[in-house]
Amino acid sequence: MVTTLQLTRPDDWHLHLRDGKMLTDIVPATGRRFARAIIMPNLRPPITTTTQALAYRKRILAAQPKNLDFEPLMTLYLTDNTIPEEITRARDSGHIYAVKLYPAGATTNADFGVTCLHKLYPVLEALQQQQLPLLIHGEVTDPAVDIFDRERVFIESHLIPLLHDFPALRVVLEHITTQEAVDFIEAAPPNIAATITPHHLLFNRNALLAGGIQPHYYCLPVLKREIHRQALVAAATSGNPKFFLGTDSAPHAKTAKETACGCAGIYSSHAALELYAEAFEEASALEKLEAFASFHGPDFYGLPRNQDTVTLIKTPWQVPESLPYGDDALIPLRGGTTVAWRLAE
């Protein structure tokens, strides 16, 4: 039985850090586990320009403890008003690695998102020319579409036509949740990839809905049926380089989750790598974790793999029931329960 795992230090290719005084509560947990992270731009107001992204980067670095060497990889928030020249500025900055597409209203702070992709074709052409990846929250927001079908319908109605018009566009379909998304990525050319979260590997929609509403398991895209969870596990453990780690760790105050209309988002940075190890161990595929966590992401982004390592030890520990979050608290994924793997300090 494996009791110790030494891995090339991984990166998180989908992370929410928030802003302001919450940064000092959130950044350290990621920096202890990951060397780099793609930082989501859906602040309020969103990060829509290179100037804003570089300023946000400075705030993140200022919140980092002195003993950590964590690099935030910045992104821009695509809006109906984004111009091609901004894409050039982003690429030339040396610190912006992608542009994020949120369909308007699809998730937290997506009010400024895109309402019509066709109006942004000049921007998408610039992204294709600059080879700057487009990161996509792949769900439709049509109220007539069942929430459990929004990812599948987005792929069929929007993503396939988009890639027909921009075949060389580098795309990451973020936080995939369905068998249909797995099938699409597997059949797609090498410029198309996907991230997978720990919570979508470990849980199906029973965690959210069975035995009473569990607001701390509410995220977007929502947890799906067990058949879809199994498809995600098979993809993550397959060794296919198109699938890589992206936690989508998204902290919200406890009071914003435990309410009549709670926010979508699951916070997992406190134990992200440990939770991935648990999922891979359950699938008898621990030997595949390093490639998924440490190799596939940088290879897709054209970045060097990290040179240092992290070590996980098979020592159960109890996740705190809550963690500090500004003037409030947040409930971490698996709060108050035991996780099988521990990060060696």
Swiss-Prot record:
Positions in coiled-coil regions: none
GO BP annotations listed: 'de novo' pyrimidine nucleobase biosynthetic process; 'de novo' UMP biosynthetic process
Positions that bind Zn(2+) 1: H14, H16, K100, D248
Gene Ontology cellular component terms for the protein in this record: cytosol
UniProt keyword annotation of Zinc present: yes
UniProt-listed SUPFAM superfamilies: Metallo-dependent hydrolases
Pathway in which the depicted protein is active: Pyrimidine metabolism; UMP biosynthesis via de novo pathway; (S)-dihydroorotate from bicarbonate: step 3/3
EC identifiers of the protein: 3.5.2.3
UniProt-listed Pfam families: Amidohydro_1
Cofactor: Zn(2+)
Active site: D248
Enzyme class (EC, first level): hydrolase
Alphabetical UniProt keywords: Hydrolase, Metal-binding, Pyrimidine biosynthesis, Zinc
Residues binding substrate: H16, L17, R18, N42, H137, L220, H252, A264
CDD domains, A to Z: DHOase (cd01294)
Signal peptide region: none
InterPro entries per UniProt: Amidohydro-rel (IPR006680), DHOdimr (IPR004721), Dihydroorotase_CS (IPR002195), Metal_Hydrolase (IPR032466)
Residues involved in Zn(2+) 2 binding: K100, H137, H175
Catalytic activity: (S)-dihydroorotate + H2O = N-carbamoyl-L-aspartate + H(+)
Assembly notes: Homodimer.
Family: Belongs to the metallo-dependent hydrolases superfamily. DHOase family. Class II DHOase subfamily.
NCBIfam families: pyrC_dimer (TIGR00856)
Function: Catalyzes the reversible cyclization of carbamoyl aspartate to dihydroorotate.
UniProt protein name: Dihydroorotase
Species per Swiss-Prot/TrEMBL record: Nitrosococcus oceani (strain ATCC 19707 / BCRC 17464 / JCM 30415 / NCIMB 11848 / C-107)
